[in-house]
Amino acid sequence: MNRVHLDHNATTPLRAEARAELLRAVDALRGNPSSVHAAGRAARAELDDARERIAAALGVEGEEIIFTSGGTEANNAAIFGGTPQGAPLYVGALEHSSVREAAEALKRAGRAVHSLPVDPSGLLDTTAMKAALEGQKAGLLSVMAANNELGTISPLEEMRLCLEGLSCASRPLWHADCVQMLGKRRFAPRELGLDMASFSAHKVGGPLGVGVLWCAKSAALSPRVVGGGQESGMRSGTENLPAIAAAAVAIELAVAEQALYTERTARLSASLWREIQSSIPGARLLGPAIESPARLPNTLCVLLPGADGRVLVPRLDLEGLEVSAGSACSSGSIEPSPVLLALGHNEADARAALRLSLGRDTTEEELRLAIKILRTTCG
């Protein structure tokens, strides 16, 4: 059976260049980067090189890069380690569970946590954000750069201008979950005025189990994982060097190829949406309009009235089409999307949405097969 993977926002296959680098590093490197002997020094040199290459791709400095086990740990490190003691935390209403649950944990511990509203397409209300921050004690602001389910891109430039208009006493540290943004739209975290940003290698063709937290030198961060003092004391534990080396290759290529990726996936996504509209009566696109610059080019969140993701996703899988009914970070469960519930959709509609996310190598032939399967299963 020919299978079609349209769940690239969950993970995208390891690209050949990253795989080659992973295997090279596994064979070539036998030392611990923290050891002082020759093998350790060679490993340290490779680690430093990967750090500098990722930093250059992101437009930041190598000493500001902290390696983690993935995007979830990077987000947790920013939320728990970047929120000053006794200071408030402000989060977007549609955050990934790794931010949402971290915020809930702080709230249970007595911290003031504020949810910032969004419009019906998932765009952050910057006027409400500024009103919530003005006159308050400076804390931490965490808003995802791009939503993993809707594909909505946050108004980062508007947010920057709002924050610049605040007094120093009220201006928070600013963290963004950039896991879905990397390689899909051009952005530079430092130019935007961010203080911290989280990334995940496997979303851009790198290996699983590697994340990056960029933390500007000016931002105070407390470590959450302590022990041997690796990563300049910010994240203890021996680094997964072969995977980090492969991640550097994948991130470099994702940034270098971003313009081509954006153009190609936007064109294919628009074509896919037109076919869905004509094939499935009542199908509705959630999030920004298909041509909007506020939408990730590869992501469609489609509401299919009367559908139930608990039944539909496995049925589509049996036919060879791999999609999701929301975020992949739910232990394999198919629950009503918290994102859609937060937007005011009822539980039935929140179960009736499919996320289709294209990748770098998605072909027109695969999309034709996907439409055939959708038409047969849902039409």
Residue ranges with predicted function:
Residues 1-379:
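Pyridoxal 5′-phosphate
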